[in-house]
């Protein structure tokens, strides 16, 4: 049955933007039918061309802005919006912070938790050039090996040298490595024919240490001219202390493969976080915005209310960043992580920092919690920093039955945070302090936050 829509593809309309979606798109309505529009801000009057319609909503492109928002700023370049690198760059930074605070508050209000206080988002003095890691695809464009970023929802590589939100030293390193690979006629990966050699260039740089790692991801085990390529990278980039070839032979969108070959230097780089030193490998999960991560983790430590006598469980412990920073303020910390290399890194990092009261186990968070519960481990505080999908129901059940006094929830997805808070309520936990958003990813809609739950006595 054909649905009668109030707009059709190709139609040009004058509309007023009412709001922003959680993805940062402007929303206009025609007869209560929403149109989602990139590069449009609330209260702007625009001319929009409808590009796609569905039964429940449409998408459109801005043809002309007829009344400009006072909060609009001149974007640095269209390419950052087209690729999704910086989809909020047209919104002034103070308003980005308000938008993120509002997003979190609105999600709580939708489930009738209007009484939850959400504090203003903690921002950055310089909300650009903050990322300490880049993973840049390599493809053949107009006959030569090229680096850049994909246009959104496409396989079209857009050549880029300045990524705007990355450490400029990393941007420079990518260009240097690209030019060396061009010089020696290395073949770029062709994803359609699964041919060619160079798939991705990854660069990590320590914010404090300035140590740099270059990872060349290849389809083949053999990297032609590997020795001379490595020597030239080291000569051109004195900060490089680690050059690694990562082999990913599968036809996949996953960036890194399972095999790392150290071509020069170390297998890891070091960096500091809240006074501790961490070894970071090619595969390590390590927060990409070190300045904001220190604020985020210090907040989590403060909210945990540690006096030095507590037992803490750190679920999703990664390379031990939260576990080890908390271990300095607790009696004992137990960390769990499902990635073997991360557990190895966590144990090395404990040794590196002389920390003896942190124990790390390789397992899923859900299974480890059940085992600790069976073994009679009684945590005072549980810290969680889950992926975007949030916490598993079995994990929350185990956590609730272990009955810690406090749960500190570091969230990268406010939707799953709100869902999980409701699940914790079934075990007698309530939010005991205002929720604090932290802007880990300026110029994007992504939101991190810290929430504290306490058990009702």
Swiss-Prot record:
The active site is at residue 412. Keywords: Methyltransferase, S-adenosyl-L-methionine, Transferase. The keyword S-adenosyl-L-methionine applies. Disulfide bonds: none annotated. SUPFAM superfamilies: Nucleic acid-binding proteins, S-adenosyl-L-methionine-dependent methyltransferases. Residues 6-64 form the TRAM domain. It comes from the Bacteria. GO terms for molecular function: rRNA (uridine-C5-)-methyltransferase activity. One of its GO terms (biological process) is rRNA base methylation. S-adenosyl-L-methionine binds at residues 287, 316, 337, 385. InterPro entries: MeTrfase_TrmA_AS (IPR030390), MeTrfase_TrmA_CS (IPR030391), NA-bd_OB-fold (IPR012340), SAM-dependent_MTases_sf (IPR029063), TRAM_dom (IPR002792), U5_MeTrfase_fam (IPR010280). Its EC number is 2.1.1.-. It is an enzyme of class 2 (transferase). Belongs to the class I-like SAM-binding methyltransferase superfamily. RNA M5U methyltransferase family. NCBIfam families: rumA. This is Uncharacterized RNA methyltransferase lp_1151.
């Amino acid at each position: 049955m054909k649905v009668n829509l109030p707009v059709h593809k190709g139609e040009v309309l004058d509309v007023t933007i009412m709001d922003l979606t959680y993805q940062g798109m402007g929303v206009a309505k025609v007869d209560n039918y929403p149109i989602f529009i990139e590069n449009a801000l609330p209260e702007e009057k625009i001319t929009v061309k409808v590009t796609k319609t569905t039964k429940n909503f449409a998408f459109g492109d801005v043809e002309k802005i007829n009344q400009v928002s006072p909060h609009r700023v001149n974007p640095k370049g269209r390419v950052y919006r087209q690729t999704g690198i910086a989809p909020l760059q047209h919104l002034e930074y103070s308003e980005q912070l308000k938008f993120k605070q509002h997003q979190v508050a609105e999600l709580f209000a939708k489930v009738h938790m209007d009484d939850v206080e959400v504090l203003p988002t903690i921002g950055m003095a310089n909300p650009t050039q903050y990322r300490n890691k880049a993973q840049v695809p390599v493809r053949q464009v107009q006959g030569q090996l090229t680096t850049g970023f994909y246009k959104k929802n496409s396989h079209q590589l857009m050549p880029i040298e300045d990524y705007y939100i990355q450490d400029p030293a990393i941007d420079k390193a990518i260009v240097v490595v690209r030019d060396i690979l061009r010089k020696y006629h290395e073949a770029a990966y062709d994803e359609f024919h699964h041919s060619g050699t160079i798939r991705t260039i990854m660069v990590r740089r320590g914010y404090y240490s300035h140590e740099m790692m270059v990872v060349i991801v290849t389809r083949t085990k053999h990297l032609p001219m590997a020795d001379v390529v490595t020597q030239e990278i080291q000569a051109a980039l004195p900060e490089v202390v680690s050059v690694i070839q990562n082999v990913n032979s599968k036809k996949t969108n996953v960036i890194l493969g399972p095999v790392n070959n150290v071509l020069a230097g170390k297998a890891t780089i070091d960096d500091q976080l809240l006074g501790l030193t961490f070894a970071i490998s090619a595969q390590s999960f390590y927060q990409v915005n070190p300045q904001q991560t220190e604020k985020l983790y210090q907040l989590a430590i403060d909210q945990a209310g540690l006096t030095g006598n507590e037992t803490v469980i750190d679920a999703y412990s990664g390379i031990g960043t939260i576990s080890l920073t908390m271990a300095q303020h607790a009696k004992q910390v137990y960390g769990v992580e499902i990635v073997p290399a991360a557990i190895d890194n966590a144990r090395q990092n404990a040794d590196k920092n002389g920390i003896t009261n942190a124990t790390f186990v390789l397992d899923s968070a859900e299974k480890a919690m059940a085992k600790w519960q069976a073994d009679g481990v009684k945590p005072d505080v549980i810290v969680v920093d889950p992926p975007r999908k949030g916490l598993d129901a079995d994990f929350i059940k185990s956590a609730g039955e272990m009955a810690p006094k406090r749960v500190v929830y570091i969230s990268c997805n406010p939707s799953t945070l709100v869902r999980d808070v409701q699940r914790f309520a079934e075990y007698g936990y309530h939010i005991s302090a205002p929720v604090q958003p932290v802007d880990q990813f300026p110029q994007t809609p992504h939101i991190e936050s810290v929430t504290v739950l306490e058990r009702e006595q």
